[in-house]
């Protein structure tokens, strides 16, 4: 089954520009158009992902035409050109939202997806509408942490922090066995709620206030056995991903915390002919279990892992931050904040510090962690 939900980034760019932009919309695209048409050196990271993806995607329609030459993808330092993408970006730059969600680009996307067995239609694209949403927030030791609500997973970071606020982490010490155990158990409890509740709020009633309440966090914290790993159902959400994050501030005090992702490395493998890009793979995160809050439905947004964030102190900006890495993101959000607030790290140290990442089943393996892994 080819499950492709509507791509939303372009509509999001348009809305951001309408609300905050002070340059012409078309001028924002010109540097990227130039890189796509004239070429740019391939970085080590991009070369790695291209090489890793080619065995999976080289038999997919149109992949080789865009990303391969003489049977190989571009290597580190090679100059890569994508004139098809340059053409598509020029259409968007000139026509704005209509250049992508209506007309020939939208028709090409819809026709291609349907030839591949998918259900995305021209009308789905034409009617797509990104939304302004209110962030969710919880106080952690005097700092307000702001995250995206469902259909994202920002609530997970808040739940982890609320649970861990019931313990003296500084006394334990960063990366002590006690701290690692408590963090992992808090993560497992938060992810159990993620698996059950997180979905498109337009289709499901999600108990956000309860999930991020301090009283609920105390109840969850009481479930943690300091001497034994708990058996908690795994979330069943795939952990792979490929994401970019950036944050920026201007002289007027505005900050942006921005994250985008095609998911699963390069995305879905679906490359509409002549457009120079691969469609994202976020539809994979729908559930196929009838009655589940995140079950696939028409017009519905799937559960998302990507979550930009802010922290404020006494109503004033403290940091704008985010990380990449699918299910790693809320775990890393919580740890960066803990490093800053509990352990007194500066921002560079908090970001550079090693991170705990728990994934897969919550069933203990009964194998000891290797000391050198810490």
Pin down the residues of each PLM region:
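Noncatalytic scaffold domains of N-terminal-nucleophile
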Residues: 4-96, 100-102, 106-152, 212-213, ...
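Short, well-structured alpha-helical segments that form the helix of a local strand-helix-strand
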Residues: 26-37, 107-111, 175-188, 347-357
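Active-site rim segments in enzyme catalytic domains, especially the processed small/beta chain
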Residues: 119-121, 254-319, 343, 347-348
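Short, small/polar residue-rich loop motifs at catalytic or cofactor-binding pockets
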Residues: 132, 240-243, 304-306
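Glycine-rich phosphate/pyrophosphate-binding beta-alpha loops
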Residues: 146-154, 244-247, 259-270, 323-330
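M16/insulysin-pitrilysin zinc metalloprotease superfamily fold
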Residues: 154-170, 311-319, 326-351
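Internal maturation/activation junctions in enzymes
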Residues: 166-262, 274-275, 282
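Extended C-terminal subregions enriched in glycine
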Residues: 300, 333, 342-374
């Amino acid at each position: 089954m080819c499950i492709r939900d509507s791509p939303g980034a372009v509509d999001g760019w348009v809305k951001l520009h309408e609300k905050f932009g002070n340059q012409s919309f078309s001028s924002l695209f010109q540097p990227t158009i130039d890189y796509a048409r004239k070429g740019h050196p391939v970085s080590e990271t991009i070369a790695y992902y291209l090489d890793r993806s080619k065995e999976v995607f080289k038999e997919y329609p149109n992949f080789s035409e865009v990303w391969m030459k003489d049977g190989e993808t571009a290597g580190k330092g090679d100059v890569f050109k994508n004139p098809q993408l340059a053409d598509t970006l020029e259409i968007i730059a000139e026509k704005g939202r209509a250049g992508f969600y209506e007309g020939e680009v939208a028709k090409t996307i819809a026709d291609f997806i349907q030839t591949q067995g998918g259900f995305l239609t021209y009308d789905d694209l034409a009617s797509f509408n990104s939304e302004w949403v209110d962030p969710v927030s919880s106080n952690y030791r005097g700092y307000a942490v702001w995250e995206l609500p469902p259909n994202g997973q920002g609530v997970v970071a808040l739940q982890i922090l609320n649970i861990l606020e019931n313990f003296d982490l500084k006394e334990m010490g960063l990366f002590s066995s006690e701290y690692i155990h408590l963090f992992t158990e808090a993560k497992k409890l938060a992810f159990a709620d993620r698996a059950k509740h997180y979905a498109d709020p337009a289709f499901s009633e999600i108990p956000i206030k309860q999930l991020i309440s301090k009283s609920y966090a105390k109840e969850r914290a009481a479930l943690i056995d300091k001497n034994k790993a708990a058996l908690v159902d795994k979330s069943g959400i795939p952990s792979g991903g490929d994401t970019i994050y950036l944050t920026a501030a201007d002289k007027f005090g505005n900050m942006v915390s921005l994250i985008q992702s095609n998911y699963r490395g390069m995305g879905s493998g679906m490359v509409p002919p002549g457009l120079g890009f691969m469609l994202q793979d976020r539809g994979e995160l729908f559930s196929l279990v009838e009655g589940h809050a995140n079950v696939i439905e028409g017009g519905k947004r799937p559960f998302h892992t990507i979550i930009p964030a802010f922290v404020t102190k006494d109503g004033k900006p403290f940091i704008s931050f985010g990380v990449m890495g699918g299910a790693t993101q809320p775990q890393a959000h919580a740890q960066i904040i803990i490093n800053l607030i509990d352990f007194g790290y500066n921002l560079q140290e908090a970001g550079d510090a090693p991170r705990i990442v728990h994934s897969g089943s919550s069933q203990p393996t009964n194998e000891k962690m290797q000391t050198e892994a810490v």
